[in-house]
Amino acid sequence: MLVTQSRHNALASVFAGLALMVSACGMSSSGEGAPVAPAGAPAPPSGAPTADPGTPPPAGATGTSTPSVVAGAPIVAPERTWTWVDIAGATCADGSPTGIGVNLTKDSDDVLVFLEGGGACWDAASCWGPAPTAFNVLTGYGKTQFDTDPQIPAIYLLDRSDSDNPFRDKNIVYVPYCTGDSFSGDKVTTFNYLGVDHETHFSGHKNINLYLSRLLGTFPKTTRLWLAGDSAGGFGASFNFGTFQEAFTKARVDVIDDSGQPIDPDPAKWAQWRSVWNMQLPADCADCAKGPSAFVDYYRAKYPTNRFGLISFDYDVIIAPFMSLSLTQFHDELTSMLDHFDTSFTNGHYFVLPGASHVGLVTPTTELKTWVKAMVSGSTNWDSVRP
């Protein structure tokens, strides 16, 4: 995939458009801020060091427990080349088939799974109106969309040519977002917009299990997997952390959550999302029904050796209105959550960028790249950073 200035502008327009969509659906924020512009990504390099496939399961792996997903057929794809893979049974919100993108290497058993971001929708207007608040709901997402997706060359974690990318020599999986439910739903419902019925598939979590089946068959030896995502994909990484860990029983799964902040939205909004999407929350986490903030303590207790990294702006101009919070309210909630990280979450750290924007990985600072590298490498110098 070649990166051009038009691609840079396309991703900037994507986030700007999402902000306008949110406003058009009756939500507003009390601050100002501009969406970020992407950093580019040249073509992948040709070499990579060999990993040791005999490494025993690291701390955090569940070892011999029964996997929750059965391994399916392995994915076969060209080396170090982005390849689209249709996944049987996976659907977008419009019911059309979808799949995943892979960039594989035989030189490592380590895996990065990256979940695409792009808003959310929960009723007729937000899903099927003229300005839907979730990406790819109207269009679906297949090979055509994959081949022109502006996020892939913009996110540096997906760029094999970036010497600062700790995943440049690992297997990379890109999970597109077209279900409008932050990868959490399993429900088919019908919305009527202006007299037209739209069957809507909130199948994000169902799709994840289908993808996991193929990934288990493709990476049977992996002992290290990182689940990352931005915006809705960041929330999806948090929602599906346990699902991945229980599936990859011989691996340790760590999470990089960019702009899917585990803070609680307006209670009515959270209740609506849970109901409309049939949100699939961890069965053994009763408090998770109260809001995303409960996930922090749940993961801390259940996976004490797994790492959880959060990236956020001080004032998130996209997430605040989605949660029906003003920017000031968002900042206060974020600060409270960060304080809780400091006192309660030994293996969870954050990197907070100053200002009002959204998604740090598209224009990463040198300091952010250093922080991500420290997290992935297992460095004991990995710590929290905020303005």
Enumerate the language-model features and the residues they cover.
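C-terminal motif of bacterial Sec signal peptides marking the signal peptidase cleavage site
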Residues: 22-24
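C-terminal His-loop and adjacent cap/lid subdomain of alpha/beta-hydrolase
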Residues: 26-28, 40, 44-387
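Long, acidic (E/D-rich), serine/proline-rich intrinsically disordered low-complexity regions
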Residues: 31-35
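Bacterial N-terminal signal peptides that target proteins for export
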Residues: 2-15
